[in-house]
């Protein structure tokens, strides 16, 4: 390919809408063009990158016996309603684009394809003899992001590889899950990325277990917690840990103390010389579920800890057997709108009476009560007395007559001790999610009645796994991790071109002929090569080559008359003056191929 035919359009200035460096470089390098918020055109350079990533993915999955298919992007609402996800994906903060056809039937543009593939498999697979099976596709997905940003990192239209496996039993599912985890590690390694695999929350996809593959980068949206020895890692949404014991409050006779205007943990501690770890703080939440009902929730946690909203939402969903569409803290204004005026915020205890909800206009009439392990482990504590300006001291859970759901809803944080080894502590880094794998179990096969006949001749539900890779996001993540002040530094395996040849002076016949000779030889040897044949200054060509990030640069310049060219490595910034044969030998060694 010649630059004169490439439609290359680079920018020197940083685009105003691009917040992170990878987004800036992709726009400046002419890789993407913004059409509207969260929607981009993949220009020829990026399309070559995406095709190379796709090729690596397809090759690796084929070695695992996966079958490639292409599923419809438009999906009927009926199967999503059967799985229980239609409302959660189309209402509130749901991410599915939905529409109606001419007959008034509701459809959705697929953000994911669990329902569709499960329906297809249920109509196709009938016996254990046909299992296991693993099917994947690579296609454009759609998500109505609340706040699309960071270019391809969080866009409304993107390319994704999603795979779905079906099994006769849990052991077989776990075996394929392990195979796919290994395949992902191979894929990301071949793409030249530094990544970590961490435990993750299953989110709206659901299932028993899941892991994320994260490219480590300071601009990453996710906070990852990793043990010092590297044996444990998790997204903070999922992470578990051991907290410090804190300053224990020795048991004594329970009593009530006056605490005027001491609504916060800090105020309570400063006025009374308490420690936050001696306090049970209670927060009121409101959970909105897919049945359109609103459930008040009282959450108790140790005063020096934070609530993990994801864990809390999951616990409520599990308890109610309903999807939580939204969860948020209740404020005094919310209470007033419900006609409730006597809740003493800042002085609430775990035993706040349900009677206060009797007059509510649109909420359920009882609190769901949840206590984090950190609070439940306290034998003696301070908490609100449910009366303004009053707290209880030396209180204990035996004195509280309301039933609490006990679970882990605490946000693990850096410095916490690790579950697997108390001598290890959690350390933090930020990451960009590029892959996610799930053990779904029978979640979808039961809701969609996808069954098969097992070895005993009994009808049973299929076991299922799903596995996603963000292809377009991976491309930008590679840039976020591989760049310098001059531009992109593509890993060789996914670079749009492996080599760029620059003719320093297009009017110099020696330079032009030598460059053309090298160009043709590289093409003959199937090297992905770009020839910069523009009638432009050499400095402009060098800057463009650095910006677009081609791994190897050959310059036919002043020494061309002697048959010598400069061979420059974009990553190491080393330059050698070599003759044609030496260049070809050097590149063949670097590409680990037969002699060029």
From Swiss-Prot:
The keyword Cytoplasm applies. GO terms for biological process: prolyl-tRNA aminoacylation. It is an enzyme of class 6 (ligase). Its EC number is 6.1.1.15. One of its GO terms (cellular component) is cytosol. PROSITE patterns: AA_TRNA_LIGASE_II. It comes from the Bacteria. SUPFAM superfamilies: Class II aaRS ABD-related (SSF52954), Class II aaRS and biotin synthetases (SSF55681), YbaK/ProRS associated domain (SSF55826). It holds the Pfam family HGTP_anticodon. One of its GO terms (molecular function) is aminoacyl-tRNA deacylase activity. InterPro entries: aa-tRNA-synt_IIb, aa-tRNA-synth_II, aa-tRNA-synth_II/BPL/LPL, Anticodon-bd, Anticodon-bd_dom_sf, Pro-tRNA-ligase_IIa, Pro-tRNA-synth_IIa_bac-type, Pro-tRNA-Synthase_IIa_type1. Belongs to the class-II aminoacyl-tRNA synthetase family. ProS type 1 subfamily. Consists of three domains: the N-terminal catalytic domain, the editing domain and the C-terminal anticodon-binding domain. Homodimer. Catalyzes the attachment of proline to tRNA(Pro) in a two-step reaction: proline is first activated by ATP to form Pro-AMP and then transferred to the acceptor end of tRNA(Pro). As ProRS can inadvertently accommodate and process non-cognate amino acids such as alanine and cysteine, to avoid such errors it has two additional distinct editing activities against alanine. One activity is designated as 'pretransfer' editing and involves the tRNA(Pro)-independent hydrolysis of activated Ala-AMP. This is Proline--tRNA ligase.
């Amino acid at each position: 390919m010649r630059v004169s035919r490439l439609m290359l359009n680079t920018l020197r200035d940083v685009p105003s809408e691009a917040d992170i460096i990878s987004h800036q470089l992709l726009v400046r390098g002419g890789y993407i063009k913004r059409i509207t918020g969260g929607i981009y055109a993949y220009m020829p350079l990026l399309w070559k990158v995406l095709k190379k990533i796709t090729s690596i993915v397809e090759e690796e999955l084929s070695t695992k016996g996966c079958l490639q298919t292409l599923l419809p992007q438009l999906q009927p609402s009926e199967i999503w309603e059967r799985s229980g996800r239609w409302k959660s994906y189309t209402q509130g903060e749901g991410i599915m684009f939905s529409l109606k056809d001419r007959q008034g039937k509701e459809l959705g543009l697929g953000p994911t394809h669990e329902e569709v593939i499960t329906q297809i498999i249920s109509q196709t697979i009938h016996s254990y003899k046909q299992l296991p099976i693993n099917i994947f596709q690579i296609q454009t997905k759609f998500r109505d992001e609340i706040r699309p940003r960071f270019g391809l990192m969080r866009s409304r239209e993107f390319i994704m590889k999603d795979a779905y496996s079906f099994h006769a039993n849990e052991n077989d599912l776990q075996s394929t899950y392990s195979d796919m985890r290994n395949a992902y590690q191979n894929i990301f390694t071949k793409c030249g990325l530094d990544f970590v695999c961490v435990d993750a929350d299953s989110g709206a996809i659901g299932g028993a277990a899941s892991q994320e593959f994260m490219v480590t980068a300071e601009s990453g949206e996710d906070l990852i917690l990793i043990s010092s020895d590297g044996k444990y890692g998790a997204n903070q949404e999922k992470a578990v840990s051991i907290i410090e014991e804190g300053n224990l409050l020795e048991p004594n006779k329970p009593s009530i103390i006056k605490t005027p205007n001491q609504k916060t943990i800090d105020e309570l501690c400063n006025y009374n010389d308490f420690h936050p770890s001696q306090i049970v703080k209670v927060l009121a939440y409101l959970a909105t579920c897919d049945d359109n009902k609103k459930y008040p929730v009282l959450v108790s946690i140790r005063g020096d800890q934070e609530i993990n909203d994801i864990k809390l939402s999951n616990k409520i969903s599990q308890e109610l057997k309903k999807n939580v569409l939204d969860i948020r803290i209740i404020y005094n204004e919310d209470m007033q709108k419900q006609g409730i005026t006597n809740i003493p915020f800042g002085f609430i205890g775990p035993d706040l009476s349900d009677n206060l909800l009797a007059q509510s206009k649109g909420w359920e009439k009882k609190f769901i009560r949840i206590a984090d392990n950190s609070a439940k482990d306290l034998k003696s504590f301070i908490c609100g007395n449910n009366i303004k300006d009053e707290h209880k001291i030396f209180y204990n859970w035996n004195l509280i007559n309301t039933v609490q759901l006990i679970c882990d809803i605490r946000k693990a944080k850096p410095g916490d001790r690790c579950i697997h080894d108390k001598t290890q502590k959690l350390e933090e880094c930020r990451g960009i999610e590029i892959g996610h794998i799930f053990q779904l179990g029978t979640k979808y096969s039961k809701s969609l009645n996808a069954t098969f006949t097992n070895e005993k001749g009994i009808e049973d539900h299929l076991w299922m796994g799903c596995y996603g890779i963000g292809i377009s996001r991976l491309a930008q993540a590679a840039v976020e991790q591989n760049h310098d002040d001059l531009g992109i530094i593509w890993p060789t395996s996914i670079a749009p071109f492996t080599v760029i040849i620059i003719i320093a002076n297009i009017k110099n016949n020696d330079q032009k002929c030598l460059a053309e000779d090298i160009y043709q030889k590289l093409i003959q040897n199937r090297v992905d090569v770009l020839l910069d044949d523009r009638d432009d200054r050499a400095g402009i060509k060098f800057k463009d080559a650095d910006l677009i990030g081609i791994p190897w640069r050959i310059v036919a310049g002043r020494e061309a008359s002697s048959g010598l060219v400069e061979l420059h490595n974009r990553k190491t910034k080393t330059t050698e003056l070599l003759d044609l044969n030496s260049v070809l030998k050097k590149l063949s060694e670097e590409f680990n191929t037969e002699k060029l």
